Structure formats: structure tokens, C-alpha cells
Amino acid sequence: MEAIKTDICVIGAGSGGLSVAAGASQMGADVVLIEQGEMGGDCLNYGCVPSKALLAAAESVQAARDAGRFGVHMAEPVIDFGQVHQHVRDVIDGIAPHDSQERFEGLGVNVIRASASFTEPKTVAAGDYEITAKRFVVATGSSAAVPPIPGLAEVPFLTNETIFSVHEKPEHLIIIGGGPIGCEMAQAHRRLGCKVTLLELFTMMPKDDPELVDVVRQRLIAEGIDVREGIGVEAVEGQGTALRVVTSDGAIDGSHVLVAAGRKPNTESLGLAAAGVETERGAIQVDARLRTNKKHIFAIGDVTGGYQFTHQAGYHAGVVVRNILFRVPAKVDDSSIPWVSYTEPELAHVGLSEEQLMQQDAKGTVLRSDFAGNDRARATGQGEGLLKVMVDRKGKIRGASMVGPHAGEVIQPWILAISQGLHIRAMTGYRAPYPTLGEINKAAASSFYTPTLYSSRTQRLVRWLMKLP
């Protein structure tokens, strides 16, 4: 084996690993980056990017179907499923150069395409190389968790890694799991002409506000998706495109089965025992500085078992770079981590939920504003939705939850507000352009002062002032 000594060895070329490698190398560190699969990781190749490209195609179909409400009448759209997936492939190919081996080698990173495994705490074997480093960053991400359902392993089930390789329209897609991936894929495929059944053992999108989730639920049902919650999957059988899912509520026949029942950290082949790194349920345990119990080994992103978002992995990368390069004791702060589910309407959240606020501050306030009261939403026929803003007794913004058009975009001022510890007055003092969806933010914030502004005390004061010359 060829021996390599380096400052930093990054294992995994997903969003987190690439950010560490690019940043550290451009700041002067010697960096080795190891990746056994595709550069760009899950997000580019099997996750965020292809799913949003597919959703965009599905949204265009739905827009054509809904055009009649604006007086624009057209025939039912003809869907070329193969061309839809070519669009998905084109989007991936357009972004791939940014994450490519060639680009990173151009940045001075030594890229090794092989599987990596620790042989001892400060050494990793990867292909024909043995890498010794001062610091290691494990950024191997996660993969679809496959539940132990009898018969599932014997049928050609799909996961997020394989569904974008299906170039012929599934006649009946049965989805196991009602989280964001399951709900997004259910809506996309239904809009593209597939029959879709969505199965969830508990309730769909359980980490989000139940009131807001119900808006999404009702939309999915209205679009023809068979949503079944509280349903256990007992077995899967069949072959090819003749599959049967046996549930606690009876059997369902379909052509394809998508498993979207959570994710698991990718740690099995890393040789963590040889490095002495502690894990729990497969996830690498880290402290607030993202250090493992071996302080020279860091872990970031999905592999730590926490929030599984691309933007979280990127944030982790920044924390690690500050710790490794500048010896700054930077720590993770998840108080303002946002997430978005890209159904239509979108579902977005940041900070404390309504329930969490009430647990922490019984005198806190939940401000509400409906998209039905937003003129831009009305004009575009998208008045379905709601914003909730969580404010503590002192007026500090603690959280925001939203369901509605472009919620992932509209919620962003609240992310900034929470990250900066702002008071609700900060969201009332700016001028929001009219008519925009973002006006809903100012409307919600202004409602904090409504009880005071329109109180009997204020009315008495105004009447007295009006008597003055």
C-alpha cells in the first residue's frame, strides 16, 4: 500500500464532506478526500436534487390541470415519463461539475475513490492507500432504512436511491412510510398519472405541527392519493411488477413498492471499532464541537444520527473547520435549524413548536396569520395555508411553523430572527412590498400588539388626546 500523510482526511464526499474539503484546502491545509460512491453524495444523486426536479415536473402537470379556474382551458396533459426522468437526469448532470473530482483536485484536494476503513485510531485504509492524518472527519451520510418486513427482501422494492432510475410510469405505487420523502413522492407520482397508496404506521409527518400537517393530508387525499395511517405492514410478496403488500387493514396489490421508512447512518464498513470510536444504534456519538470520544476524529451530518438535512451537514462542516483549522471551540447550536417538506402546499418549520413553547413558557403567545388573508395568495389561487409564530412572554421570537405556498422561502426571515435572538418588534418595523406572500410575516408579527393597540385603555388615551387643541 502507498502511504499518505496529511493534515485532514475527510471520509465521504456528500455536502458536508465536500464543504470541509473545499474550505480546508483553500485555507491552506493538506486534505485527502475519500469517496466510494458518487461525488456529491445522496443529496445530489438520490435525494434533494432529483426529488425536487421530479416535483417540478409534477407541479407543471398540476398547474395545467388547475388552469381552468383562471379561465384557461386545456386538455389533460400528456406525460412522457421517460422525458420527465431525463429532466431529472439533466438537472443532476448540470450540478455535478460543482461537486466533481476534477473540481476538487483543482482546489488541491487529493481525491481517492475507494471504500475507507480505520485500521487504527490515526490510520485509514482506502483501496491501494494507507492514509495517516492529524484529524479525520467522518461524513458518510445515511441510507434508506429497510424495515424487517417478511418477504420484502425477496421483491424488487425501491428506495430513494433507485426510484429515480424507474423510467416507465408505475401503474400503482405503494409507499411504505409517511414522512417527507414518502409524502413528496406520493404527490409527485400521483400528479404524473400513477395510482398511489401511502401507508404509515403512525401519523404522517410526525415531527411537524399536527394542525399544519392536516392541510397537507387533505390536499393529498383531494388529489386522489389513498392515505392510510395507523396501518402496519405485515408482509410483501410477488415478483416483477405484480406485488402485494399485506397490511393490518387487508392486502393491497400494486406494481411498485417504495420504502421510505426512515434512514440509518452509514457506519457499518468504517472499522470504527479499530479506531475506538463510540456509536449508538449505528450513529457516531459526538460532543457539541462534533468531536467523537477520540478527539482527533470528528463526525458531521447524517452519520451522527441527528437532524438529517443537507443544510445541517453544511453547517456542521463550518463548525468543524473552525475547530480544526483555527482551534476555535466552536459549538453546534440547533435552536434555529429549519426544515421544509416540499409537498404542495409546502410545510416549513424553525425553532420551537407550539407544544414546545407551551412546555417552556406557559405565558408564551402563538401568533397566527392565514394565507387566505394574503392578497398575493388570493390572486394566485393559493389561499390555503397558515403561519404560526411562537413568542415567549418577553416578546422574543422562539419558533415559526408554516404551511402554504412557497413556505420554504417565506419562512426564511424567521430563521434569521431566531438565530439572532430578535424581539417580535423587529418583524413589524420593516416595509413589506405589496402584494407579496411575505406580507404574512409582518401580519403575524403585528398581531402581537393588537390586544394593546385596540384595548379600552388605548381608546381612552386617544379620546383624551383628541380633546387637546
Where are the predicted features?
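FAD-site-proximal beta/loop scaffold in flavoenzymes
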Residues: 153-169, 251-326, 413-415, 428
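Flexible, glycine-rich terminal cap/loop adjacent to redox cofactors
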Residues: 9-37, 49, 53-60, 342-353, ...
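Short, acidic, Ser/Thr-enriched surface-loop or helix-capping motifs
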Residues: 113, 287-288, 391-393
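Short hydrophobic core segments
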Residues: 9-11, 116, 131-141, 175-176, ...
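Short glycine/serine/threonine-rich phosphate/pyrophosphate-binding segments
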Residues: 16-20, 42, 157, 182-185, ...
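Glycine-rich flavin
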Residues: 2-5, 22-29, 34-169, 197, ...
